[in-house]
Structures are given as C-alpha cells and as structure tokens.
C-alpha cells in the first residue's frame, strides 16, 4: 500500500494544486471519491485492466460511468492516468487528495474509540482538547468497543494514542514476557 501511495502522490499533488488554484477543491474531492469507489468494483476493475481496450476507451468509459461528477478537466486527468496505466491508482489518489485538502483547510479526521459511549459534553470537550493540541479543526468520529475494557483509543493519520485498559494490559503482558 505504501508503494501505491508513493506512485500516486505526484498525481494527487498535481491535481490538488490545479483544484486549489481554480477554487474547485470540493468538486475535485467529490469527483475523485466517486471515481475511486467505482474503480474498485470487480467488473469495471477487470475491464479497466483489459489490454484489448485503448487508454482512451478506458478513460471515456470511466468518465461515462461517473458522468454526473466528471468535468472536462477530470476527463483529461483520467486520460492521462489511462495512458500511463495508472487508473488503478485512483483510490490512493483520492485518499491523498483528501489528506492534502484537510491539510489545506487546517483540519484533521480523528477516530475516537471508547469502551463506553460518551455524552455530548464529553465528546465536545474531547474535540476541543484535540483541536487545541493538534492546532487544527477536528472532524471527530466516535464509536464504542466494549473489548477495550476501559479508556480510549484515538487515531488520526499515523498518530495512535492508546489509553485503553486492553492496550495497557497488552503492554504489561509484553513486558512480563520479555
């Protein structure tokens, strides 16, 4: 997966710069999200990998399937990807584009998992605390997982803060066994 992101990064960065300069970041994010979700469908994925179809046919087919969101620049981007045999990178390009978008907006997606459901006040306090610590606007997604026993696990990008009882027990067991 890391290799895919390495190859996808220049494409995502280039398309993000174009979108930013033209003020169409949201439109490009939506378009890339739809294109990425469509390209993982097994039948379409097989067709896009079929060497019997030309790059132009593949790009046009994908643009037609996603006609509601695909712009002329989007079609040109798809053609460039198809010519370079990079249509399979669309999910990674979309994910990286979203990261660039969040960074540009000084925002971050945070996944918060707790053993018990938090109240609205606790959730707001957590979001405010994380926003201050990360110096970003926080888009908080929360879920409960009773297997944590107690405490919380916070994930954002590569940062994971494991304050769960399960995590502490695992660390203790590792220390005892080593």
UniProtKB/Swiss-Prot annotation:
Role noted for this protein: F(1)F(0) ATP synthase produces ATP from ADP in the presence of a proton or sodium gradient. F-type ATPases consist of two structural domains, F(1) containing the extramembraneous catalytic core and F(0) containing the membrane proton channel, linked together by a central stalk and a peripheral stalk. During catalysis, ATP synthesis in the catalytic domain of F(1) is coupled via a rotary mechanism of the central stalk subunits to proton translocation. This protein is part of the stalk that links CF(0) to CF(1). It either transmits conformational changes from CF(0) to CF(1) or is implicated in proton conduction.
The organism of origin for this protein: Marinomonas sp. (strain MWYL1)
Annotated InterPro entries: ATP_synth_OSCP/delta_N_sf, ATPase_OSCP/d_CS, ATPase_OSCP/dsu
Keyword rRNA-binding: no
Protein name, per record: ATP synthase subunit delta
Pfam families: OSCP
Assembly behavior: F-type ATPases have 2 components, F(1) - the catalytic core - and F(0) - the membrane proton channel. F(1) has five subunits: alpha(3), beta(3), gamma(1), delta(1), epsilon(1). F(0) has three main subunits: a(1), b(2) and c(10-14). The alpha and beta chains form an alternating ring which encloses part of the gamma chain. F(1) is attached to F(0) by a central stalk formed by the gamma and epsilon chains, while a peripheral stalk is formed by the delta and b chains.
Subcellular location: Cell inner membrane
A GO term from the CC aspect: proton-transporting ATP synthase complex
């Amino acid at each position: 997966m890391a290799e895919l992101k390495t190859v996808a990064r220049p494409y995502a960065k280039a398309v993000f710069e174009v979108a930013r300069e033209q003020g169409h970041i949201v439109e490009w994010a939506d378009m890339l999200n739809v294109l990425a979700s469509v390209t993982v469908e097994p039948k379409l994925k097989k067709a896009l990998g079929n060497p019997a179809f030309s790059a132009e046919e593949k790009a046009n087919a994908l643009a037609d399937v996603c006609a509601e969101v695909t712009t002329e620049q989007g079609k040109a981007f798809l053609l460039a990807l198809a010519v370079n045999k990079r249509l399979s990178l669309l999910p990674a390009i979309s994910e990286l584009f979203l990261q660039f978008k969040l960074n540009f907006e000084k925002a971050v997606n945070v996944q918060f998992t707790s053993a018990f459901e938090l109240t609205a006040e606790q959730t707001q306090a957590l979001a405010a605390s994380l926003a201050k610590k990360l110096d970003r606007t926080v888009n908080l997604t929360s879920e409960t997982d009773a297997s944590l026993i107690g405490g919380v696990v916070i994930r954002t990008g590569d940062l994971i803060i494991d304050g769960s009882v399960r995590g502490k027990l695992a660390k203790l067991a590792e220390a005892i066994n080593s």
